[in-house]
């Protein structure tokens, strides 16, 4: 079955190409739920079984998923449901019962099948994912991302923000409601806040999957450095490279706000900044989705996000799958901005500072 290759998918863009760190799942639709069709459902299950068997990040788990799906299909477990969404939810629950994965899911009618224009990593081209940005206080810059869609609108907004706030003494990045996406926006930021080339995280993908479906990375991208890895695995290190013309942000204190809704690519950002000690993470442990992959159609009217790779700390070999990235300063998510401002030497509360954002 065909996949679209992405890097990390976002909650705002639940239909993401296959190497996106997918985001937390979106509801299939706010409209009436599509009717259940037995033939369509059975075709979706057959194609999903093949997809996970051939592509899932852990081959043994992929085989176990496939065996379960085929056994359930044979005994008629997917023969009748009140609607298509109930069927998709049941299949997702069955998958998670075999092996938990924060991204793996079957869903109904993703955006790409409804004809919505997609950015290279699955986000609508005209949506600016910078929710808020500006000065919270003299010298204290703030930017709030809903996701990392990798589109032109968001890239332009990030460029403007970095230029306008290049002399900030403190930078607060709010990822508390960031469901993920791609690497583009964080690479823009990394280029300004790191003062030397720095290894961030390591990303593994099954060699057979990359050969069959391609790679979400530009082979010549200096930010995705190919390194030696285990047999059957293609390993890359994501690195930060300072921009040729850097701003004062390379010396700024950086604070990253997190919550349990911080997911996927936003967790990639979290681990990268925590591991390198380039930022202080404030808030809650993140959502726990460390596997990247992509969305592929399953039969008629269904699609599945199938994880094909994992992102992890090169120092420990451990990812944040199922556990999340722990903050440096643990506070409830709604108090994270207050704490960041306090550490930045600002006496105002987060609520009052946001009302005067400029």
Regions found by a protein language model. Give the residues of each.
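Mature extracellular/periplasmic domains of secretome proteins
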Residues: 240-246, 271-272
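Extended C-terminal subregions enriched in glycine
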Residues: 253-271, 280-287
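Gram-negative bacterial Sec-dependent N-terminal signal peptides
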Residues: 1-21
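C-terminal soluble interaction/assembly domains
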Residues: 274, 281-299, 304-306, 318, ...
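Low-complexity, Gly/Ser/Thr/Pro-rich intrinsically disordered linker/tail segments
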Residues: 318-358
């Amino acid at each position: 079955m065909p996949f679209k290759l992405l890097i990390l998918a976002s909650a705002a863009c639940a239909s993401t190409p296959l190497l996106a760190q997918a985001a937390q799942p979106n509801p299939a639709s706010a409209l009436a739920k599509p009717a259940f069709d037995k033939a369509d459902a059975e075709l979706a299950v057959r194609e999903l079984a093949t997809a996970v068997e051939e592509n899932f990040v852990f081959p043994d788990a992929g085989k176990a998923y496939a065996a379960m799906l085929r056994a359930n299909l044979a005994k008629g477990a997917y023969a009748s449901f009140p609607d298509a969404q109930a069927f998709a939810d049941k299949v997702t629950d069955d998958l998670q019962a075999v092996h938990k994965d924060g991204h793996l899911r079957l869903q109904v009618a993703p955006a790409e099948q409804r004809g919505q224009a997609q950015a290279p990593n699955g986000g609508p081209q005209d949506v600016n994912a910078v929710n808020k940005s500006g000065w919270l206080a003299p010298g204290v810059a703030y930017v709030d991302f809903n996701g990392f869609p990798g589109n032109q609108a968001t890239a332009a907004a990030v460029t403007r923000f970095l230029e306008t706030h290049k002399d900030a003494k403190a930078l607060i990045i709010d990822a508390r409601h960031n469901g993920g996406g791609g690497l583009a926006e964080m690479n823009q930021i990394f280029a300004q806040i790191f003062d030397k080339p720095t290894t961030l995280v390591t990303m593994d993908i099954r060699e057979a999957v990359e050969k069959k479906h391609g790679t979400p990375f530009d082979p010549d991208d200096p930010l995705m450095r190919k390194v030696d890895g285990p047999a059957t695995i293609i390993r890359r290190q994501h690195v930060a490279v300072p921009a040729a013309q850097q701003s004062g942000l390379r010396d700024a204190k950086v604070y990253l706000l997190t919550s349990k809704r911080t997911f996927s690519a936003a967790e990639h950002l979290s681990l990268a900044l925590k591991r390198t000690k380039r930022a202080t993470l404030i808030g809650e442990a993140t959502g726990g989705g460390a596997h990247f992959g992509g969305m592929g159609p399953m039969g008629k009217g269904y699609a599945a996000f199938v994880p094909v790779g994992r992102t992890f700390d090169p120092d420990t070999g451990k990812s944040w799958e199922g556990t999340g990235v722990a903050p440096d300063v643990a506070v409830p998510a709604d108090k994270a901005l207050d704490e960041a401002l306090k550490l930045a030497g600002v006496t105002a509360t987060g609520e009052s500072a946001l009302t005067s954002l400029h």
